[in-house]
């Protein structure tokens, strides 16, 4: 059975689930779609870094350039939603920050996911993060920029989604806590 999860008319990309093959296929109707190439390069960079840090993980992606799609393995995991507050997602934010510290090389200029939010992470067994959706991948950005994006989006997106006029104080306090912990003692560019 085949199921179309979504199709973005603006980006001209979509996601299909093939249950018989146990794969997720990301495709583009635009043959010059750079985001699909970024997705493949970024995810494979991440897998290479991830593999060297975490054992017993075997993922294989397949880029079929001729037909403009990427096959990803089906990953059974929990998805966290961006509209949950930082307080609600605090456990997952902590896990993800620790994951970043373990996986990303400690160079001042590094690879960048480009859209790191809780929405773009799958959590196996509620604990092991797998970062997905690498379409905005870049090779040369400042180390920690993804965590900046993660923390800012964790307070802004729920506020916007719930149409609030301000960010609750508890959210700002948590933001400051994790920002300070992450960047304390780090030399930033």
Pin down the residues of each PLM region:
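ATP-binding glycine-rich loop module of kinase domains
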Residues: 5-44
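Active-site acidic catalytic loop and adjacent metal/ATP-binding pocket
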Residues: 16-19, 104-145
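Anionic group-transfer/hydrolysis microenvironments
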Residues: 28, 75, 117, 135, ...
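Short, flexible/disordered intra-domain loops and linkers
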Residues: 28-38, 83-85, 157-173
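Conserved kinase catalytic-core helix
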Residues: 37-67, 73-119
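Helix-rich C-terminal or lid/interface subdomains of diverse kinases
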Residues: 69-71, 149-152, 168-189
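Active-site Asp-x-Gly
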Residues: 127-172
